[in-house]
């Protein structure tokens, strides 16, 4: 009688492994959804531009502005709870893990490997000043600010949660302030950076106006946010659920919305031509 060979068992083992992965993904998905299930929320019935909202049949939490096309979160978290949401444990450890993303201590390496950090540095070298003061709002995990510090810039970071601030100070020795922009005192800057933050802002017009107030004449700001400009349904394809996250993302923009947003300030658009990836579109604006 022949002994069973190892390969006879490989397929069942692969199947069991696949089922385990599916189960773990489902468990993490449940944890991600339930993590802030009971967080206090506010009701929003208008766009940041004042436009009325049409129903959006692809996500019940969002409406679509009939004026500028912005996707508007109709029930975002209460602003007073933002420092809790973006804490070191709840956000940078648990929420990232449940969503399948690296935690804060490993996120910087991801930015190096996937090319984001290189693209951001390239944008600074192409559009930004050769020296001066840099402000980065939402600077965790700190790799971009550290990179610019090593190039001789005078760097200032901002994070909303004090535990995250302590982590950045302790692990990267960065000058980081705690607060929610624009409700925080900061110096004037020659370069303003904010990657994947604008979509979180409760008041984007105040956010952009505050950028102008903090920029020296001739200063430049480089922002990254998801901009729906592609003939893809649902918007952003496989990243739809990640982008239409009604805990984190208050507004999701279109090119028309970005032009309107910047047009309401004294800043000028320099470029909308770059991106790090789908849903990682880059905005370059300058102060005359």
Which positions does each model-derived feature cover?
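Conserved N-terminal segment of class I S-adenosyl-L-methionine
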Residues: 3-195, 205-209, 222-224, 238-239, ...
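A generic structural motif
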Residues: 153, 267-268
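Residues at helix C-cap/C′ positions in short coil/turn segments immediately following an alpha-helix
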Residues: 172, 265-266
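A short His-aromatic
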Residues: 196, 200
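Helix-to-beta-strand junctions that scaffold the AdoMet/dcAdoMet cofactor pocket
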Residues: 201-202, 215-217
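Short "lid" loop at the C-terminus of a central beta-strand within the Rossmann-like core
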Residues: 226-231
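C-terminal alpha-helical "lid/dimerization" subdomain adjacent to the S-adenosyl-L-methionine
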Residues: 243-251
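Short alpha-helix
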Residues: 250-265
């Amino acid at each position: 009688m022949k002994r069973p060979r190892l390969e006879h068992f490989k397929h069942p083992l692969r199947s069991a492994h696949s089922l385990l992965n599916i189960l773990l993904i489902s468990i993490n998905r449940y944890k991600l959804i339930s993590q802030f299930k009971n967080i206090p929320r506010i009701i929003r019935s208008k766009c940041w531009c004042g436009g009325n909202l049409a129903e959006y049949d692809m996500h019940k939490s969002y409406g679509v502005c009939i004026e500028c096309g912005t996707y508007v979160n109709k029930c975002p978290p209460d602003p007073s709870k933002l420092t809790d949401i973006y804490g070191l444990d709840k956000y940078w450890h648990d929420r990232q893990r449940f969503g399948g993303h690296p935690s804060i201590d490993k996120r910087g390496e991801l930015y190096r490997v996937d090319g984001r950090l290189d693209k951001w540095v390239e944008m600074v070298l192409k559009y930004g000043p050769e020296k001066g003061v840099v402000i980065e709002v939402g600077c965790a995990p700190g790799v971009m600010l550290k990179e610019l510090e090593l190039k001789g810039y005078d760097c200032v970071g901002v994070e909303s949660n004090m535990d995250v601030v302590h982590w950045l100070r302790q692990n990267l020795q960065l000058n980081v302030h705690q607060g929610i922009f624009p409700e925080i005192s900061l110096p004037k800057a020659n370069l303003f950076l904010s990657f994947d933050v604008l979509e979180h802002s409760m008041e984007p017009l105040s956010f952009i106006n505050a950028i102008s107030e903090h920029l020296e004449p001739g200063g430049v700001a480089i922002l990254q946010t998801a901009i729906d400009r592609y003939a893809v349904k649902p918007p952003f394809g496989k990243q739809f659920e990640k982008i239409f996250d009604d805990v984190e993302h208050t507004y999701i923009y279109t090119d028309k919305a970005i032009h309107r947003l910047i047009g309401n300030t004294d800043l000028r658009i320099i470029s909308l031509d770059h991106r790090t990836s789908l849903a990682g579109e880059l905005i370059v604006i300058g102060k005359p």
